[in-house]
């Protein structure tokens, strides 16, 4: 899976370098949802064993056909997590993703698109890449609670055969 094959999401100008005409409130809401998704991905992928290996989480947002690394303003929202990197600093190699400069093991996570189910609920497509054989695409449920936006985890849809 290449990052350029992932699906698109409209993103705030604060998230990536590209300008946007969306209203500021919508951009702030999208940014908050994406931050919630990436925080949840840190919890999901970087357990004690991965942290001991020095694994980093490299994040990208796809605003329309090509994944892009978030801008500094977006990254500042995740500053409390020292293992988070911009995807531009990582390489997706068949045997395993790595941080380009250090060759530390990496997981590349791309968020998008956002599907608004309600004013206080979004479903977000998330793709991750560890290696050519260990990668996936899923949808995550993100809801607005009193303390802000929270990613509740993957959406499992089941139906009759």
Name every feature range the model reports, one short phrase each.
Residues 21-136, 156-161:
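Flexible low-complexity loop/turn motifs enriched in small/helix-breaking residues
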Residues 137-160:
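Short beta-strand edge/turn micro-motifs at domain boundaries
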Residues 4-5, 16, 50, 82:
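Residues at the start of alpha-helices and the adjacent loop-to-helix junctions
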Residues 10-21:
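Hydrophobic h-region of N-terminal signal peptides that target proteins for export
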Residues 1-10:
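Bacterial N-terminal signal peptides that target proteins for export
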């Amino acid at each position: 899976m290449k990052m350029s094959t992932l699906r698109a999401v409209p993103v705030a100008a604060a998230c990536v370098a590209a300008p946007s005409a969306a209203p500021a409130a919508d951009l702030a809401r999208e940014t908050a949802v994406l931050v919630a998704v990436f925080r949840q991905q840190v919890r999901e992928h970087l357990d004690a064993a991965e942290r001991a290996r020095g694994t980093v989480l490299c994040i990208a947002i796809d605003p329309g056909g090509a994944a892009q690394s978030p801008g500094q303003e977006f990254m500042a929202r995740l500053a409390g997590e020292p293992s988070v990197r911009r995807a531009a600093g990582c390489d997706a190699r068949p045997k395993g993703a790595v941080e380009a400069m250090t060759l530390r093991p990496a997981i590349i996570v791309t968020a998008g698109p956002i599907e608004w189910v309600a004013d206080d609920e979004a479903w977000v497509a998330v793709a991750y890449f560890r290696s050519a054989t260990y990668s996936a695409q899923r949808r995550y449920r993100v809801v607005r609670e009193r303390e802000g936006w929270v990613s509740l985890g993957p959406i499992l849809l089941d139906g009759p055969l």
